[in-house]
Amino acid sequence: MQVSVETTSGLERRVTVGVPAEKVDVAVEGKLQEAQKTIRLDGFRPGKVPMREVKRRFGGAVRNEVLADVMREAFIEAVEQEKLQPAGMPGFEATTNEAGKDLEFVATFEVYPQVELAAFDSIEVEKPQSEVTDADVDTMIETLRQQRAEFADVDRASEIGDRVNIDFKGLKDGEAFEGGTAEGQNLELGSGQMIPGFEDGIVGMKAGEEKDIDVTFPEDYQSEDLKGQAVVFHIKVNKVEGKALPEVDAEFMKGFGVDDGDETKFKAEVRKNMERELKNAITSKVKEQAMDGLVNLHEFDLPGALVTQEIQRMRQQMMQQFGGGQQFDPSILPDDLFKEQAERSVRLGLVVRAILDKNEIKADADKVKARVEEISEQYEKPEEVVSWVYSNPQQLQQIEGAILEEQVVDLVLESAKVEEKTMPYQDAVKPREQADG
């Protein structure tokens, strides 16, 4: 089999492959003979259609089918022979395709880039140092009370913390604008759900009252038409509800798995969960910074096919997350929406794979086992969860992948500049974007 390789641009390769005529013609003849046994045509007995007629009617389609198989098989042999690593599916084009003549075809595809790993000592990582204090536990218990608050109608002016049911209509230069009108909307005052000034304007209103409030949209508002614009909202309050917080009693604690109503046990359980959250948050922040450092350190061409695949995966994930099981038009989620993140993901994946290969890193079996047990402890029957994970290759592979990433992070941190920074619990558990903001 004759093979020639041409680099057309960047990662794109053009491979020309020659296949002996006999290999194609024999395969075509064999398929036609098989087809002859089952073809039914008017005027002929089943299985007795002359080969001449079979070739006339079906020869072209059968040859195309054979060509697809032959080109695919020959391509696999060619890339193995030339030690190429295709990224994505190739495009095939037969340049010589006649019975009795050698087949020649061209396969165009991208290859994986050669990733030259840089030193990690320029990567900077800020590692939060924090602990869960008694005050943090008390604050969390108050948050849990807020989450389980109940609202009831009150006959008084609204206050911060109340929930109001309102109708509103926004006007800009006397004209209604898109998204500025709603009826029967519930709003907790002080939640920051609406633009600045909106909720404050409702404080002090009673059920049945109406008034206009003047507000200005923030300069960074998502709508170009409304950024920095002064508008008037006509507000009608339909209902005012006061918030009633539950007592921290036996019934309340039972909802968190403390059946005997022991407050000491309850606080210990809350602290345990907070410490787990703190540990995970610190690990996540350190990992994200290390991964960002790897991405920023390595610049190389990315296979477009891999980026396209990642964009499709991200789009599908978003459709499943927000589609609510409904039919979703993918056109409202253009490629540009995902491209930057997709490129980062592909680049990071290639760098991580290069690190794993260079350092011959395999998933640490003890760490995998510990992670499986940690996950299982969150369920009622841990033993069944452990058994299920180890009998489910896809689930186990996900856990092994997470452990491999952690092992890569550990390797990076051995060389990176790591600065420990003491901070309160609330700051430590905030996502990086919020903490930086």
Swiss-Prot record:
Family annotation (PROSITE patterns): FKBP_PPIASE
Main location: cytoplasm
Transmembrane segments: none
Domain PPIase FKBP-type, chain residue ranges per copy: 161-246
Keyword flag Repeat: no
Keywords: Cell cycle, Cell division, Chaperone, Cytoplasm, Isomerase, Rotamase
Localization in the cell: Cytoplasm
GO terms for MF: peptidyl-prolyl cis-trans isomerase activity; protein folding chaperone; ribosome binding
InterPro entries the record matches: PPIase_dom_sf (IPR046357), PPIase_FKBP_dom (IPR001179), Trig_fac (IPR005215), Trigger_fac_C (IPR008880), Trigger_fac_C_sf (IPR037041), Trigger_fac_ribosome-bd_bac (IPR008881), Trigger_fac_ribosome-bd_sf (IPR036611), Trigger_fact/SurA_dom_sf (IPR027304)
Catalysed reactions, semicolon-separated: [protein]-peptidylproline (omega=180) = [protein]-peptidylproline (omega=0)
Protein EC: 5.2.1.8
BP GO terms, sorted: 'de novo' cotranslational protein folding; cell division; chaperone-mediated protein folding; protein transport; protein unfolding
Top EC class, one word: isomerase
Pfam families: FKBP_C, Trigger_C, Trigger_N
Keyword Cell cycle attributed: yes
Record SUPFAM superfamilies: FKBP-like, Triger factor/SurA peptide-binding domain-like, Trigger factor ribosome-binding domain
Family of the protein in this entry: Belongs to the FKBP-type PPIase family. Tig subfamily.
Function: Involved in protein export. Acts as a chaperone by maintaining the newly synthesized protein in an open conformation. Functions as a peptidyl-prolyl cis-trans isomerase.
Domain notes: Consists of 3 domains; the N-terminus binds the ribosome, the middle domain has PPIase activity, while the C-terminus has intrinsic chaperone activity on its own.
Protein name: Trigger factor
Originating gene: tig
